[in-house]
Amino acid sequence: MREIGHFIGGKQVAGTSGRTSNVYNPATGEVQATVALASVEELRAAVENAKAAQPKWAATNPQRRARVFFKFVELLNKHMDELAEILSKEHGKTIEDAKGDVIRGLEVCEFVCGIPHLAKGEFTEGAGPAIDMYSIRQPVGIGAGITPFNFPGMIPMWMFAPAIACGNAFILKPSERDPSLPIRLAELMIEAGLPAGILNVINGDKGAVDAILTDPDIGAVSFVGSTPIARYVYGTAAMNGKRAQCFGGAKNHMIIMPDADLDQAVNALMGAGYGSAGERCMAISVAVPVGEETANRLVEKLTPKIESLRIGPYTDDKADMGPLVTKEAYTRVRGLIDRGIEEGAKLVVDGRDFKLQGYEDGYFVGGCLFDHVTPEMDIYKTEIFGPVLSVVRAQNYEEALSLPMKHEYGNGVAIYTRDGDAARDFASRINIGMIGINVPIPVPLAYHSFGGWKASSFGDLNQHGTDSIKFWTKTKTVTARWPSGIKSGAEFVMPTMK
């Protein structure tokens, strides 16, 4: 049985803790590997490697740091098929979806190729008599990232690319459910010219997370996962004096106005609701049609499309979606569907008993559609993280708008309409971080920042874009005056610009 270890000091190393976790093939339910779970001592080994390598890397000029990422982008493109297959084998998503996962991470690496410009400070000449003032950005030192299972390519690159480009060393703790791709990415970074010790990958469970959060040499932590764990990571990191950005759960709504192009909205809902089997923090899980006629037509058009979804293993290049990632995820999603029925929602399309011939033990759930869902129901409040779409009917625009505004989560939201006034009002008033206008999954591109509001985000700086440069650097402001500019002796009052 293959055992996946760690990546420390520029090479793969075997685990030494004696603790492991199984890595499953989601399509078959079979164990395909084990992954080592790091001890505190193994994390410290990674940190010591990072400490030794980081000062020289920070002193490397930004053009040379950028060249590593230019080469890394080239290698990602060269190895795209290999990377997608590694990802799909452990996660279960289709090959094309896996390529999209890697490509969105690649785009962040392209963005940080501009680090010579992005990390520039500010300068004020003549701030006072013969006084110049300037600010510089310097790396935090050692950063860490704790990433979820659902995007094992994109989200690690969200974190380590800007952190390393800014001159930091980095400790990555990926999900133990699909740990192979992050290690392969680390190997490619070394091939691209990154010095050993700058990027380390530690596999592990809560013990590894706690070791990261309490390690005195780690200065900043980035996290993506569920809201309860995001709160825990944020609070623990803060108590240990660390900068933290933590991103949690979501319940993303799409409002469909009566004037919307309904066919366009339906196609958007299919991709946004059922792509990646719904295991996306930006999946649309709630459709809010405005008016009974709009709702009836929407459900009528959605039903046959959901029933005809092609579901299969990653080796099926015609599959629309694959299995859920683990048996636990499968059981949880099935339980929430059952709960929705108990609460009185109408299950229009029931995919609970979907079985794929030859893959009967896989974690497949067919597409499901609930109608007549209300805000009091658990299936409305809870992030299901599966191929389940809930229809909540609204009688008018104001009622529709109030639904996502009152929800605990505030990650993403979308509106489909031909009315520019309604769209502008929506974008202005909604209390959610990422907004789509006739765009179903409003994930910002790499040069803008990604982040939600409310219980979807903890911390004041987002992922990628210019926020990422600010997060992974500290600002130092210098006020300089040379002797020829000193005209008077000691002063004992607060200096001001007279």
Enumerate the predicted regions with their spans.
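Residue-level signal for inorganic ion chemistry
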Residues: 29, 65, 87, 109, ...
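Glycine-rich loop-to-alpha-helix module at the N-terminal edge of alpha/beta enzyme cores
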Residues: 32-119, 130
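ALDH superfamily catalytic-core signature
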Residues: 228-374, 437, 486-488, 493-498
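Hydrophobic face of amphipathic alpha-helices that form TPR/SEL1-like repeat modules
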Residues: 1-27, 352
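Rossmann-like NAD(P) dinucleotide-binding subdomain of oxidoreductase/dehydrogenase enzymes
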Residues: 121-267, 394, 459
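A structural signal for short, well-ordered beta-strand elements
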Residues: 22, 36, 58, 91, ...
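Conserved C-terminal structural/oligomerization subdomain of aldehyde/semialdehyde dehydrogenase
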Residues: 28-34, 218, 255, 310-313, ...
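Structural signal for hydrophobic packing residues in well-ordered secondary-structure cores
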Residues: 54, 58, 73-80, 84, ...
